[in-house]
Design a protein with these regions (language model features):
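Short, glycine-/small- and polar/acidic-enriched structural segments
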Residues: 1-67, 72-75
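Short, flexible segments with low predicted structural confidence
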Residues: 23-24, 82-84, 106, 171-172, ...
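Bilobed "Venus flytrap"/periplasmic-binding protein-like clamshell domains
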Residues: 47-114, 228, 232-237
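Sec/Tat-exported extracytoplasmic proteins
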Residues: 10, 15, 22-28, 56, ...
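An extracytoplasmic/periplasmic, membrane-proximal ligand-sensing/linker region
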Residues: 103, 107, 114, 124-142, ...
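Second-shell loop/turn segments in exported
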Residues: 39, 69-76, 185-191, 223-231
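Pocket-lining segment of extracytoplasmic ligand-binding domains
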Residues: 18-20, 28-29, 58, 95-187, ...
């Protein structure tokens, strides 16, 4: 949604998933007929981990076990939906083999708890509030992504990286979870001036500790990591900031 709003100049800044940004900017994937431009990158803020949640008593222990199950893959045209579809396809599970449904995270968590669905995908920063709230109400577990699947995903999309959800991130989760992650990227409209964006970029890094208190995810803000996993050009204002710190980024 943020990408479309930016491209139509309804908003001046927004956060979106790196792989979705790449497709929107280049007119590929779900944006093949609706290319969205008019924005550029400022910085990657934090990794969004792909979390596949099932009930602890479900008997589902791997992605292969989702065969024939009801699975929420996130809202339509969302980054979560794109990631979920890719992972299911790479595991040989097409739409015909899995009953995929499009629910937001809150709805999906409720339906998993009531037994109306068997699993749901959630691509978000840790610790995801809705998952922690669910974990406190009923026993859940997470499905790991195999090394072969993650390697295939990373070779197809350079925006994905291996990621480990540490043990005890959530209530009752005593083992680490192997998965993949994609960066949540801060974007700026092309209409924002270079001076404004350069100042915003500087503020972002100089006050990262203060900003951490205002968000529920673990911000990972340093200039070096903030430019990784982004395939679209950076805003000229951000480019100027990074140049001052001897960091080369993609520009037009």
């Amino acid at each position: 949604a943020n990408i479309r709003l930016l491209s139509k100049n309804y908003i001046e800044m927004g956060i979106a998933q790196a792989d979705l940004i790449n497709d929107a900017y280049n007119g590929t994937g779900i944006f093949v007929s609706t290319q969205c431009s008019g924005y550029k990158a400022i910085a990657a803020l934090y990794p969004e981990a792909c979390q596949i949640v099932v009930h602890n008593d479900s008997g589902i222990n791997s992605i292969d076990d989702l065969l024939g199950k009801k699975v929420s893959i996130g809202e339509s045209d969302s980054g979560t939906e794109q990631t979920a579809n890719l992972i299911l396809q790479l595991n040989g599970l097409s739409d015909k083999l899995v009953d995929t449904l499009n629910y937001d995270y809150t709805t999906a968590a409720g339906k998993l708890q009531s037994g109306e669905i068997d699993a749901f995908f959630c691509t978000a920063g840790l610790r995801t509030t809705i998952i922690e709230e669910l974990a406190q109400q009923c026993p859940i577990k997470f499905l790991s992504i195999s090394d072969s699947c993650s390697k295939k995903l990373e070779s197809a999309y350079d925006t994905y990286v291996d990621y480990t959800i540490p043990a005890n991130t959530y209530t009752g989760q005593t083992e680490e979870i192997k998965t993949v992650a994609v960066q949540a990227v801060l974007l700026a409209s092309n209409e924002l001036s270079d001076i404004v964006v350069e100042s915003l970029t500087e503020f972002l890094f100089e006050h990262s500790a203060d900003l951490q208190y205002s968000v529920p995810v673990n911000l990972q803000l340093d200039e070096t990591s903030a430019v990784k996993g982004i395939s679209i050009p950076f805003h000229p204002g951000a480019v100027k900031y990074y140049k001052k710190h001897n960091i080369k980024v993609k520009s037009e």
